[in-house]
């Protein structure tokens, strides 16, 4: 409750990245004029880029019209010739902004605005009357006034505490959602409407507008992010002219998240959009898209909050491999590069993703990376965390992966045989012990001669190690005896040299 009070009462000044020069080479267009064009959104924890020049002063949103919301007739109650004028008047009504922290204050006006927004949504959705260009411009201005705003700071910024686990952190729900939802619905209906001419609409849904939408993805409210995801996806699909810009702008968000903040609420939603975009990539794949995989998607495995967005990230990665199987080696080596060392839950996620990637991997690409891959799998097999060891052993339940292993058993079995023996001899978990025994039997049936050779080499190595250890102990014992004699026959215990 304290967090919500702090969020409601403490809002930091807006500093939109839309008005800053991009540090990743994306030029930004001039802002549109008119109400709402200077309305910006930012998050207090996502300030200006490191070492960037100071941001220009941003104009505040225009104040709403004076007076109260004016009750207006329904569209069906006026002649068709007057509906455009009525549409504009209703848009003006919806430019009033209200304080939703006080549920009683302006209750009548809030309800009038809500009903008006519902009418506007129905009017656009019905397509009963095509709206003019001036009406479209005013509608986008009204939408901008309502949705583009300063986001409340994250809870740890108010309290000074370390950021909590993203999965456990209670999201902040926008109090004005009863109005905000309808504004988003209106924008969505406008974008998807068959009556919307992209040649006209792109004047108002321009690069500046798209950037401000992207800023809003940092909202903690999952309902808002869901609408933003759908709307941006539809904009990407309908406005082909914006596609390269949208991809680059999303890249910028990812770069900042990976290399600077590791804090952003909308990474999962942005990855969902990209998953659909990747699915539509034409073949042969452009170099730009391959670089996106290498420079953005693979490094996204590094941040600590990966558990929040891993499902969407894994889908994007697998889409790339399914589109172009030659990328499998690059992806697998990328996973190995960022493989977690001490985080067992994260390691389980990596093993699950690895299985999906291997399912789409062809033999030639598999052979390129199988040595480092099975060295890592071997380490997972002997993990003291039984869930990690189990998850690694479950790879042998996949027929495609077993087929790849069988084709390259002469290389793979010598790598993992020692780990199989170690599990059988000393792993504390009975389930891991049983699964390891099954895999050992599988290799024995797959190639008895190779299995016996690996067993012989393992036994020889163990015997040699035992011999070396005995020799080491004997050497230390001789040194201890020599030291005792040198000191005049003193007690051996006082002069024992320990290894």
Swiss-Prot record:
Tissue spec: Expressed ubiquitously, higher levels in cotyledons and flowers.
GO molecular function: protein phosphatase regulator activity
Basic residues composition-biased segments: 1-13
This protein's record includes keyword Nucleus: yes
Recorded coiled-coil stretches: none
Primary location group: nucleus
GO terms (BP aspect): brassinosteroid mediated signaling pathway; megasporogenesis; meiotic sister chromatid cohesion; microsporogenesis
UniProt keyword annotations, A-Z: Brassinosteroid signaling pathway, Cytoplasm, Nucleus
A GO cellular-component term linked to this record: cytoplasm
UniProt keyword Plastid, yes or no: no
Disordered: region residues: 1-65
Subcellular location(s) per record: Nucleus; Cytoplasm
InterPro entries: ARM-like, ARM-type_fold, PP2A_B56
Any Pfam family hit: B56
Assembly information from the UniProt record: PP2A consists of a common heteromeric enzyme, composed of a catalytic subunit (subunits C), a constant regulatory subunit (subunit A), and a variety of regulatory subunits such as subunits B (the R2/B/PR55/B55, R3/B''/PR72/PR130/PR59 and R5/B'/B56 families). Interacts with BZR1. Interacts with BRI1. Interacts with SRK2E/OST1.
Protein family per UniProt: Belongs to the phosphatase 2A regulatory subunit B56 family.
Protein role: The B regulatory subunit may modulate substrate selectivity and catalytic activity, and may also direct the localization of the catalytic enzyme to a particular subcellular compartment. Required for the formation of the PP2A holoenzyme that positively regulates brassinosteroid signaling by dephosphorylating and activating BZR1.
Protein name (Swiss-Prot/TrEMBL): Serine/threonine protein phosphatase 2A 57 kDa regulatory subunit B' beta isoform
Species annotation: Arabidopsis thaliana (Mouse-ear cress)
């Amino acid at each position: 409750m304290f967090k919500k009070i702090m969020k409601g009462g403490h809002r930091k000044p807006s500093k939109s990245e839309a008005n800053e020069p991009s540090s990743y080479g994306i030029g930004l267009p001039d802002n549109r004029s008119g109400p709402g064009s200077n309305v910006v959104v930012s998050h207090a924890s996502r300030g200006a880029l490191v070492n960037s020049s100071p941001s220009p002063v941003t104009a505040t949103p225009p104040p709403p019209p004076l007076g109260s919301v004016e009750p207006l007739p329904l569209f069906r109650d006026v002649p068709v010739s007057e509906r455009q004028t009525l549409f504009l008047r209703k848009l003006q009504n919806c430019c009033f902004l209200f304080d939703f922290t006080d549920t009683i204050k302006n209750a009548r006006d809030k309800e009038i605005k809500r009903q008006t927004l519902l009418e506007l949504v129905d009017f656009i959705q019905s397509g009963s009357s095509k709206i003019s260009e001036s009406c479209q411009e005013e509608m986008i201005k009204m939408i901008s006034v309502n949705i583009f705003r300063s986001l409340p700071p994250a809870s740890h910024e108010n309290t000074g505490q370390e950021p909590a686990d993203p999965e456990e952190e209670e999201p902040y729900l926008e109090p004005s959602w009863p109005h905000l939802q309808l504004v988003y619905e209106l924008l969505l209906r406008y974008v998807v409407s068959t009556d919307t001419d992209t040649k006209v609409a792109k004047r108002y849904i321009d690069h500046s507008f798209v950037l401000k939408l992207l800023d809003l993805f940092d909202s903690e409210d999952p309902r808002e992010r869901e609408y933003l995801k759908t709307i941006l996806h539809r904009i990407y699909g309908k406005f082909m002219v914006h596609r390269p810009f949208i991809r680059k702008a999303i890249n910028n968000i990812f770069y900042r998240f990976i290399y600077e903040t590791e804090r952003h609420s909308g990474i999962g939603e942005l990855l969902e959009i990209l998953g659909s975009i990747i699915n539509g990539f034409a073949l042969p794949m452009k170099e730009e898209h391959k670089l996106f995989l290498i420079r953005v998607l693979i490094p996204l495995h590094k941040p600590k909050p990966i558990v929040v967005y891993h499902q969407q990230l894994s889908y994007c990665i697998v889409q790339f491999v399914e589109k172009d199987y030659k990328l499998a080696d690059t992806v697998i080596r990328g996973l190995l590069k960022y493989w977690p060392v001490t985080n067992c839950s994260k390691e389980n996620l990596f093993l699950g993703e690895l299985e999906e990637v291997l399912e789409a991997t062809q033999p030639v690409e598999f052979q390129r990376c199988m040595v480092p891959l099975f060295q890592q799998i071997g380490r997972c097999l002997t993990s003291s965390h039984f869930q990690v060891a189990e998850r690694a052993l479950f790879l042998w339940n996949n027929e495609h992966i077993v087929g790849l292993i069988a084709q390259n058993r002469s290389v793979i079995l010598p790598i993992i045989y020692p780990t199989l023996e170690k599990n059988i001899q000393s792993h504390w978990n009975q389930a891991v012990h049983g699964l390891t025994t099954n895999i050992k039997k599988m290799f024995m049936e797959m190639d008895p001669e190779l299995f016996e050779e690996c067993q012989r080499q393992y036994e020889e190595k163990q015997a040699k190690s035992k011999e070396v250890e005995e020799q080491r102990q004997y050497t230390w014992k001789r040194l201890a005896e020599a030291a005792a004699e040198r000191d005049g026959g003193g007690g051996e215990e006082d002069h024992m040299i320990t290894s």
